[in-house]
């Protein structure tokens, strides 16, 4: 059964990966938005992390992972359609993850002293049947890159501990640790306890290996810092992770993104990630010092200390937990429940969730008539998908906990995207009125079907015509509007 599933599950995963679902804004704005601005010269949304005054994100991981692919798409394949670019990126992410899994997982499973192919295959089946693999890992999250880098470092650690590591692996270990840290500041949290184990076991046996890794880390970090300083065109040295750490240590900053109880990772996110898979984990008392388990403990301990805790921050734990499973044949009923759980989550997160946003932008592009697009009660529209080099992007601002329209450029009447996020309906009315005052005759309003009653109220003042509707689109943020209304995304023409 395992061998058949190992071939079948990647095929299913690839189909899901190519769906236009939209899980979180960061999958676009922290990666693809900046890459499209740099490589294709579009006008888009620069997230706060990449603003020159903040420089809290490193460009190096983006260019290292995606740079060659973007050169290929732009200069050789001549890919211009944003939807095709998105599909290529997701295909690339999925195949890269599979390649790293097939390389690293056997080492991590065997690190648990389980020297047989059946264990490796079952660990692969567990990962490949997880909705996290299908829905999150193929999307362009920095967390997805973090997972890949972590697997590579831990696989190198197993070789170091078993005296199989050569010079190339030692040098690459230092490089990968440096890149991982500049990819996400959470990366060291996954590595701290495993690194301590490696350090203590190797220090007196082959201390020169630690020196090689340290030198490699130092040189790699210097190169990355120089690259980021160049990209930000700064006169001062830019150390992006340091800026990010300082930002995240300020609770007031975290409050802008949402504060969570410190038990959220352990009691909410882990069950959401693993579901019934938690019941498939064997007794690990004899494996306390194995690298995957140490990495899990290390990450949960340190990441739970922070007040902002999102599910995607724990993406790397899926392949780590796969090394701690009991054999499927001992609990076949649990494995079936696991498959049902992941199929359901896949449909919700991999197909339906905010699934109308990307097709809607694609439809608007096909009309080749962009005046003013107002998005309301959806995730922020990935403006890179407009593929527009003269685009103006406006959004709301918050002053003294009051949301306002001070940053919206009402004098811009064409090629203008306005993201009103989840503001009150009164602010939507104010925005439309301000555009009317500035001489705008009509505009687009894109809203989920859960806002139908508000559209009806708007129709009492303006002529509102439904132009288009996209399905599937699941709006989980407004469940109070009724199950029948949370499906679908609609485009309206508002004549002023």
Curated annotation (Swiss-Prot):
What EC class is this? transferase
* Single GO cellular component term: endoplasmic reticulum membrane
Q: Which UniProt keywords apply?
A: Endoplasmic reticulum, Glycoprotein, Glycosyltransferase, GPI-anchor biosynthesis, Membrane, Transferase, Transmembrane, Transmembrane helix
Q: What does this protein do?
A: Alpha-1,2-mannosyltransferase involved in glycosylphosphatidylinositol-anchor biosynthesis. Transfers a fourth mannose to trimannosyl-GPIs during GPI precursor assembly. The presence of a fourth mannose in GPI is essential in fungi.
A biological process term (GO) from this entry: GPI anchor biosynthetic process
Q: Superkingdom, according to UniProt?
A: Eukaryota
What is the E.C. number?
2.4.1.-
Query: Which organism is this protein's natural source?
Result: Candida glabrata (strain ATCC 2001 / BCRC 20586 / JCM 3761 / NBRC 0622 / NRRL Y-65 / CBS 138) (Yeast)
Chief place where the protein resides: endoplasmic reticulum
Q: Which residues form a coiled coil?
A: none
Q: Would you tell me the protein name for this molecule?
A: GPI mannosyltransferase 4
> How does the record say this protein sits in the membrane?
Multi-pass membrane protein
**Where is this protein localized, as stated in its record?**
Endoplasmic reticulum membrane
Chain's gene name:
SMP3
- What pathway does the UniProt record associate with this protein? Glycolipid biosynthesis; glycosylphosphatidylinositol-anchor biosynthesis
Q: Which residues are glycosylated?
A: 156, 459
């Amino acid at each position: 059964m395992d061998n058949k599933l190992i071939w079948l599950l990647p095929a299913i995963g690839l189909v899901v990966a190519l769906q236009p679902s939209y899980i979180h804004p960061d999958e676009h704005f922290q990666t693809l938005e900046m890459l499209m601005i740099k490589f294709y010269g579009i006008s888009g949304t620069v997230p706060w992390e990449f603003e020159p005054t903040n420089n809290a994100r490193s460009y190096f991981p983006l260019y290292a992972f995606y740079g060659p692919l973007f050169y290929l798409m732009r200069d050789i394949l001549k890919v211009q359609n944003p939807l095709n670019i998105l599909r290529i990126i997701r295909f690339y992410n999925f195949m890269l993850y599979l390649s790293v899994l097939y390389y690293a997982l056997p080492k991590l499973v065997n690190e648990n002293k389980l020297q047989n192919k059946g264990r490796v295959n079952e660990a692969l089946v567990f990962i490949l049947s997880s909705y996290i693999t299908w829905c999150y890992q193929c999307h362009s999250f920095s967390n997805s890159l973090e997972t890949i880098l972590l697997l590579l470092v831990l696989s190198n650690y197993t070789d170091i501990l078993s005296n199989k590591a050569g010079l190339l692996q030692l040098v690459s270990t230092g490089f990968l640790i440096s890149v991982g840290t500049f990819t996400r500041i959470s990366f060291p949290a996954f590595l701290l306890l495993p690194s301590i184990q490696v350090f203590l076991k190797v220090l007196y046996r082959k201390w020169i290996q630690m020196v090689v890794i340290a030198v490699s880390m130092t040189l790699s970090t210097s190169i990355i810092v120089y690259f980021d300083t160049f990209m930000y065109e700064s006169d001062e040295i830019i150390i992006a992770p340091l800026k990010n750490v300082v930002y995240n240590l300020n609770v007031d900053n975290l409050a802008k993104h949402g504060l969570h109880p410190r038990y959220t990772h352990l009691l909410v996110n882990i069950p959401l990630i693993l579901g019934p898979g938690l019941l498939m984990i064997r007794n690990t008392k004899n494996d306390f010092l194995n690298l995957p388990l140490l990495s899990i403990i290390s990450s949960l301990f340190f990441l739970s200390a922070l007040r902002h805790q999102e599910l995607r921050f724990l993406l790397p734990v899926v392949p780590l937990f796969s090394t701690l499973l009991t054999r499927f044949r001992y609990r076949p009923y649990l494995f079936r429940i696991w498959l049902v759980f992941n199929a359901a989550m896949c449909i919700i997160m991999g197909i339906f969730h905010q699934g109308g946003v990307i097709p809607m932008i694609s439809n608007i592009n096909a009309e080749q008539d962009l005046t003013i697009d107002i998005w309301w009660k959806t995730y922020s529209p990935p403006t890179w998908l407009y593929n527009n080099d003269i685009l103006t992007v406006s959004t709301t601002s918050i002053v003294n906990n009051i949301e306002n329209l001070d940053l919206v450029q009402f004098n811009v009447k064409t090629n203008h995207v306005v993201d009103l996020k989840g503001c009150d309906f009164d602010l939507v009315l104010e925005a439309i009125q301000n555009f009317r005052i500035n001489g705008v005759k009509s505009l687009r309003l894109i809203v989920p079907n859960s806002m139908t009653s508000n559209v009806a109220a708007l129709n009492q003042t303006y002529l509102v015509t439904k132009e288009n509707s996209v399905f599937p689109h699941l709006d989980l943020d407004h469940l109070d509007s009724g199950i029948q209304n949370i499906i679908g995304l609609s485009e309206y023409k508002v004549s002023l």
